[in-house]
Regions:
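Hydrophobic ligand-binding cavity/cleft-lining segments
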Residues: 1-37, 97-151
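Beta-strand/loop substructures that line and gate deep hydrophobic ligand-binding cavities in soluble
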Residues: 54-103, 123, 173-229
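Residue-identity detector for threonine
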Residues: 16, 25-28, 39, 49, ...
């Protein structure tokens, strides 16, 4: 058994349609994940307005991303992002999975806006690390939140107080129950409370200052793991 879903999120961006198109189709390491993770077929590739990527599997499974981009005054753009597909497994769990995907999508598109406003076009180094199994506990994200020095009610623009290398001078750019975004002059740090969705706490970094990718991943993994041991 399985359940289909469709999640649509709309927002404006501080960039032209051409810049948004480039970010969505070629610069995903700067705000989402590396483009090689997008292994589906390009069903539509109409620059700079319409893009559809689709993966298909057995028993009717599919995962599809669609972006429709429109110009707005003053060099801005509007994008409608639609993520559709099929949840494997128990359909009764589909509602929770859909909520998790929606929350992730809103956070990712916020990160896209941050990239376009502060780092557009700059080379990026991407790192993705996951907490240990112990981070899946009910208070897993609260442990991370305390280590970052970001209270649940901290407003956008508030200072963080994390001690991990690279986070000096970080400010909050996003803060919800399950997600935190921090921005420095050199990078975007994204923190995911996936313990709320049955997974470990995780983090990604989009570094725009030429960090060594291997050392960056090692440093962050040691820090994150250390919070739960």
């Amino acid at each position: 058994m399985s359940a289909e879903f469709e999640i649509a999120v709309e927002r404006e961006f501080p960039a032209t349609p051409e810049q948004v198109w480039q970010a969505v189709t070629a610069e995903t390491s700067a705000w989402l994940f590396p483009p090689e993770a997008m292994t589906g077929e390009e069903l539509v590739f109409e620059a700079p307005t319409h893009h559809v990527n689709r993966m298909e599997g057995t028993d009717g499974w599919f995962n599809q991303l669609e972006q429709v981009i429109e110009p707005r005054p003053n060099g801005r753009s509007f994008m409608r992002w639609v993520h559709s597909g099929v949840f494997p497994g128990d359909p009764a769990e589909g509602e929770d999975q859909e909520d998790g995907i929606r929350q992730h999508t809103v956070f990712y598109l916020h990160t896209l806006a941050e990239y376009l406003e502060h780092f557009a076009g700059r080379p990026v180094v991407f790192a993705d690390v996951q907490g240990p199994e112990t981070s899946m506990a009910a208070d897993g994200f609260e442990v991370l939140r305390a280590a970052l020095g970001v209270a649940a009610d901290a407003p956008v623009g508030a200072a963080a107080s994390a001690t991990v290398a690279g986070l000096d001078g970080a400010i909050v750019d996003y803060n919800t129950a399950n997600f935190i975004g921090l921005r420095t002059d050199a990078a975007l740090y994204r923190f995911f409370g996936r313990n709320a969705f049955g997974g470990p706490v995780g983090m990604t970094v989009h570094d725009f200052a030429g960090a060594d990718p291997e050392q960056l991943a090692v440093t962050l993994q040691e820090w994150l793991t250390g919070l739960y041991t």
